[in-house]
Amino acid sequence: MNNYMINPSIVDLLTKVDNRYSLVTVTSRRARQIIDGDEALVNVEDAYKPLTTAIHEVNAGKVSYESLVEGIK
């Protein structure tokens, strides 16, 4: 079993977004953009996967999103 901490931590990432659901949505959509050819906004040495890059971008404050106030009608 690996004995290391995930960096950045979930606690740190949750300070950048409203809640866990927003974190999942923002990082997954950004990872999809990277897969589709968008340039990475941060340089992460060991980021082999688009999701890892997206997580580091959220942590660096490079990714923004807009919460919709309206609910389902």
From Swiss-Prot:
Q: What class of enzyme is it?
A: transferase
Note whether Transferase occurs among the keywords.
yes
Q: Which domain of life is it from?
A: Bacteria
Q: According to the UniProt entry, what is the EC number of this protein?
A: 2.7.7.6
Any one GO BP annotation for this protein: DNA-templated transcription
Would the keyword Metal-binding turn up in this protein's UniProt record? Answer: no
User: One Pfam family this chain carries?
Assistant: RNA_pol_Rpb6
Q: Which GO terms describe its cellular component?
A: DNA-directed RNA polymerase complex
InterPro entries xrefs:
DNA-dir_RNA_pol_omega, Pol_omega/Rpo6/RPB6, RPB6/omega-like_sf
Q: Name one GO molecular function term.
A: DNA-directed RNA polymerase activity
Cysteine disulfide links: none
Quote the catalytic activity from the record: RNA(n) + a ribonucleoside 5'-triphosphate = RNA(n+1) + diphosphate
Matching entries from NCBIfam families are given as:
rpoZ (TIGR00690)
Identify its protein family: Belongs to the RNA polymerase subunit omega family.
Subunit structure as annotated in this protein's UniProt entry? The RNAP catalytic core consists of 2 alpha, 1 beta, 1 beta' and 1 omega subunit. When a sigma factor is associated with the core the holoenzyme is formed, which can initiate transcription.
The record's function comment reads:
Promotes RNA polymerase assembly. Latches the N- and C-terminal regions of the beta' subunit thereby facilitating its interaction with the beta and alpha subunits.
- Which protein, by its recorded name, is this? DNA-directed RNA polymerase subunit omega
Q: Which organism is this entry from?
A: Clostridium novyi (strain NT)
